[in-house]
Amino acid sequence: MFKLDHWPLNGLDSRVAGKLLLAQMYEELTGEEMPPIEKAPRGKPYFPGSELHFSITHTKSTVFCAIADREIGIDAEELTRKVSPNLAEKILSPKEYAQYEAVPEEERNEALLRFWVLKEAEVKCSGLGLRGYPNHTEFDLDDPRVQKIGTCVVAVICAEEPQVEDNTEPREASDAL
């Protein structure tokens, strides 16, 4: 299960708007009133006793919220935000930096914003805070988890579902004897 929504802030306080949006989404998904929110030791908010996870982010103009049945992180930036090119050397892996350098100069700001929101969303998903940030993760510039929504670039990352591998060969019960 996954749901993503956003609201324009229109002068609303971003924290208030985020909680209102989250409450609305929770009620739409469950038919119940949103439970109280608690924080994990590193500050990641969660619903105690619930299988639903959420993440909220905002820009100057918009608040975004994502809810899923597994750990999730979301981040957004206004496409008009100018980022120092020096940041690329600090947060990008060598592979990411090569992709960034291959982009025409007039598109590099958006490319850096795309990497930035992916890294922020991953950190929020993991709940590790700054310990897992930012160059412990590596992404491709064309990662499909980044999209443009309105005037923003937005990344949503969900934790992978555990994969159970069956490495055993089929056997007969008599083989165990």
Please annotate each region the language model reported.
Residues 1-177:
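Core catalytic alpha/beta fold that binds nucleotide/phospho-ligands
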